[in-house]
Amino acid sequence: MTMEEMKNEAEPNSIVSMTLYAVMYPVFNELGRINPSAAQTLRAAFVKAEKENPGLTQDIIMKILEKKNVEINFTESLLRMAADDVEEYLIKRPEQEFQDLNEKARALKHILSKIPDEINDRVRFLQTIKDIASAIKELLDTVNNVFRKYQYQNRRALEHQKKEFVKYSKSFSDTLKTYFKDGKAINVFISANRLIHQTNLILQTFKTVA
């Protein structure tokens, strides 16, 4: 996927902003141990800039890599890094159902992030696919469990995000079927990144309305 293709994705909280939390947030966290004030200021500036110009962080990173003549598969690298918890998305409520939601989302993202290491070993990759399917089901079961137990004024937003997650899960499944025909791993990486992004948006939506 080219930069322009990623930017043209018509979805809220666009996937191009994944670079902010997958790449830069860990940098801010490290800086925070040395200079908390500077880290906080820098984080706020990047968040504001990314909100106003989705994809800006990715543009900056790509320009730096280009200037340093570093050639990497950015989509693959992003997938490898995207499994880490993002504090801004984690649900703080102490009830077990919400902590289960955090845990199931974490498990799914972790399995998806292993795809680049598994995809060239057919046996291991087939097992990874089974693990992903199970993790998706467990996350959806947990979402439904929260729905049953808690009432929300903004239930429509939650239902919408759940439908988006299901849509991208099916898209990921379709991408896998195509991969076994054409062998294009990059499309699997792109689809996995989208699914991780939707997983984070589920957490974000629950955190916002919970």
Curated annotation (Swiss-Prot):
Name the source's superkingdom.
Answer: Eukaryota
Per UniProt, subcellular location reads as: Cytoplasm; Golgi apparatus membrane; Cell membrane
- Aminoacyl-tRNA synthetase keyword on record: no
Q: Which UniProt keywords apply?
A: Angiogenesis, Apoptosis, Cell membrane, Cytoplasm, Golgi apparatus, Membrane
Provide the membrane topology annotation. Peripheral membrane protein
* Single GO term (MF): protein kinase binding
Q: Which GO terms describe its biological process?
A: angiogenesis; apoptotic process; blood vessel development; blood vessel morphogenesis; chordate embryonic development; Golgi reassembly; heart development; heart morphogenesis
Any one of the GO CC terms: FAR/SIN/STRIPAK complex
Quaternary structure?
Interacts (via C-terminus) with CCM2. Interacts (via N-terminus) with STK25 and STK26.
What family is it from? Belongs to the PDCD10 family.
Instruction: Tell me the function of this protein.
Output: Promotes cell proliferation. Modulates apoptotic pathways. Increases mitogen-activated protein kinase activity. Important for cell migration, and for normal structure and assembly of the Golgi complex. Important for KDR/VEGFR2 signaling. Required for normal angiogenesis, vasculogenesis and hematopoiesis during embryonic development. Required for normal cardiovascular development. Promotes cell proliferation. Modulates apoptotic pathways. Increases mitogen-activated protein kinase activity and STK26 activity.
Q: Which PANTHER family match?
A: PROGRAMMED CELL DEATH PROTEIN 10, TF-1 CELL APOPTOSIS RELATED PROTEIN-15
Give the protein name, as stated in the record: Programmed cell death protein 10-B
- Gene expressing this chain: pdcd10b
